[in-house]
Amino acid sequence: MSVPKTMFQLSGRGYAAANLSHATLVIIDAQKEYLSGPLALSGMDAAVQNIKQLVTAARNAGRPIVHVRHLGIPGGLLDPQGPRGRFIEGLAPLGDEPVVEKRLPNAFAGTDLHERLQQLGHLDLIICGFMTHSSVSTTVRAAKDYGYRCTLVDAACATRDLPYQHELIPARDLHRM
């Protein structure tokens, strides 16, 4: 039996994974909310360590990093004024690294992310963060609409189990999709 091909492979329009020397690192929602509590994600320890490695490599290479932060409801999940809405230790922006604040899963919707990326002048994006099934995948798909070439670092992403029709879809299955 043959292995199915992706749409990119079938169309001949695929591209190689981004090289950090020509890319912008985009970190999505690296916030404390996902470490514990009702939105705790599976595989966070490994994902956080892998994001830290990406951040270190980008900073050492002088590459741009854009941080995306989800603004929840005051007193609720991802509370922008509360501790759970803050960046995870070691993943907070330094110096002039920009922060794009969003209220929807798509980091381009209602934000200046596209303009900031245009100013940086790179079409190649290396994307990581949380949650794989929501903000990460939605942002990657939207980036394609703007003409960006995205490399998703799956080992630097995490998600959670989700309910579906009285069953559970495990995080590991969602993450693979």
PLM regions with names:
Residues I28, R63-H70, V153:
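Short beta-strand segments at enzyme active-site cores
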Residues G75:
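Class I S-adenosyl-L-methionine
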